[in-house]
A protein has these predicted regions:
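Acidic carboxylate diad motif detector
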Residues: 1-36
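Positively charged, helix-rich recognition surfaces that bind polyanionic ligands
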Residues: 24, 37-253
Length: 253
């Protein structure tokens, strides 16, 4: 690393647009340069830092905890009833992308105009990808710093997409990538990440009296408990139950 650039073998010093400052005290381990479909070059730099002893908070009922229930329309609903502040770039840019893809279909393949339009489409795809990844990074960092315990469901994403025919929605919200970020950032920030058993009836269990509503259908978006009369949004209730179960699992470990 030299000034605002980086020295690479045979290429010399290349100027970099840095997205964040490099933490002091690290040893440069590797540099990966890649050329993406949008025509831009990206450089991924890895540093090694001395190991520091990570201190997790002592498990207790007083610790700050939250449960997250995955959502197709939003990234998640949490146990406080809040929806993730998550931009869905593919939905937002879908109309523009479709328009540019139609233009591409009218171009003669292998012509200069085709190649030019192909780059426009590629840039849109790259913009969507980078917006989504950036937002996921910010959300996962915020949560793992704010909470001592985050509980989520242990879901089979591939099976869920096929069974419920929700592939596009669930691929767009990036839940799998989000969980991966939570796991490694939880270790880094001293936050417990508990995965609840996928067979745990989070949606069917009343968060007030613990009655299990076995006849609840996927189309029922509001939970009405026939025992205590609890009336609550289905996803919010699932998040509350995930939160309670995660805390129980941690305290009993």
């Amino acid at each position: 690393m030299e000034g605002k650039g980086i020295r690479l073998p045979k290429l010399g010093i290349l100027t970099l647009i840095r997205h964040r400052k490099v933490k002091a005290g690290g040893k440069l381990k590797s540099v990966t340069v890649c050329h993406e479909k949008d025509g831009k070059w990206y450089c991924s730099i890895s540093f090694e830092y001395p190991k520091t002893e990570l201190v997790y908070p002592k498990p207790s009922e007083d610790m700050k905890h939250i449960g997250l229930d995955m959502s197709a329309t939003h990234l998640y609903v949490d146990s406080n009833g809040e929806l993730a502040d998550f931009e869905k770039p593919y939905k937002k840019l879908q109309e523009k992308l479709a328009r540019e893809q139609r233009k591409l279909s009218y171009r003669q393949k292998d012509s200069k105009n085709y190649e030019k339009q192909h780059k426009v489409v590629a840039r849109l795809h790259a913009k969507i990808k980078h917006q989504r990844k950036d937002r996921l990074h910010k959300l996962s960092e915020q949560l793992t710093r704010e909470y001592d315990l985050i509980s989520i469901e242990n879901l089979d994403m591939s099976g869920l997409k096929q069974t419920l025919n929700l592939g596009k929605s669930y691929s767009d919200n990036g839940w799998g990538m989000f969980v991966t970020m939570l796991l490694y950032k939880g270790k880094r920030n001293g936050c417990y990440i508990i995965k609840i058993d996928k067979w745990f009836p989070s949606s069917k269990t009343c968060s007030q009296c613990r009655y299990v509503h076995k006849d609840l259908q996927l189309s029922d978006r509001t939970y009405v408990c026939p025992v205590c009369g609890n009336l609550i949004d289905r996803d919010e209730q699932a998040a509350i139950n995930i939160d309670l179960e995660g805390l129980r699992v941690l305290l009993s470990a």
